[in-house]
Amino acid sequence: MSHITALLIKELRLRTGAGFMECKRALIEEKGDIELSIDNLRKSGQARAEKKIHNITNQGLIFAKIKNKIGAMVELNCQTDFVAKDTLFYSLGKEIILTALSKKIKNIDDIRNVFEIKKTELIVKTGENIKINRFSFIEGDNIISYIHSGRIGVLVSASNLNQETLKNIAMHIAASKPEYLSPNDISDSVFKREYEIQLELAKKQNKSSEILKKIVQGRMNKFVNDISLVGQKFIMDNTKTVGALLNEYNARIISFIRFEIGDKIFN
């Protein structure tokens, strides 16, 4: 044990983030070999990390970047706001998004496989479950990304629209949470479910069938506009809808993606 110096233990701690006694144990077991000790800690750390994988991860950060006409966005989750602010957590998120773009990875399972070891190492260092929760991308000639406070992320692809207006629309999406691009994208099942709810509510008003029909129609028009981007009132000028704004430029939104920390947790 005499060859296991404090300096060696310190080096192993710096490289792994593991505790003093864990590092000392690993070095003793591996006869002072630093690389074998790292592997030793990974193996034991994996066991500890496995115990944490069922912990709910409802904190974290959204990362987004655009490169070569591809916009990518990832939601990296942890358990507490404290870890979300950690530089190691932030660095992992940045590395994930940069790697996805540079290697043109478009599948979340591939992303998870590439970063499984680094994610596990960070679980050991932070003592929290960490999860690559969502990943998505957009392709196009005119894309913009917008991140609000690290907790909301938006990617938007458009045609015939300047970057300033496109950014304003991205900010609108972040704030207004549209679920669909246009009313035409709303599924029949979603529409039917809401219609049945509004019909039952309207019946309680004891109006004639003709008036009930108009009441329900008005509520359904509001419903489809509220959840579709082009039907929403533009937050920077509520005298017009996003659709009307696009018409002014003879432009269109091709697609958009919106992530928000905590709105879809798959633990």
From Swiss-Prot:
PANTHER family linked: ELONGATION FACTOR TS, ELONGATION FACTOR TS, MITOCHONDRIAL
Name used for this protein in its record: Elongation factor Ts
Involved in Mg(2+) ion dislocation from EF-Tu as annotated region, ranges: 80-83
InterPro entries membership: EF-Ts_dimer_sf, Transl_elong_EFTs/EF1B, Transl_elong_EFTs/EF1B_dimer, Transl_elong_Ts_CS, UBA-like_sf
Subcellular location: Cytoplasm
Function: Associates with the EF-Tu.GDP complex and induces the exchange of GDP to GTP. It remains bound to the aminoacyl-tRNA.EF-Tu.GTP complex up to the GTP hydrolysis stage on the ribosome.
A cellular component term, taken from the record's GO annotations: cytoplasm
Keywords (A to Z) from UniProt: Cytoplasm, Elongation factor, Protein biosynthesis
Record organism: Buchnera aphidicola subsp. Schizaphis graminum (strain Sg)
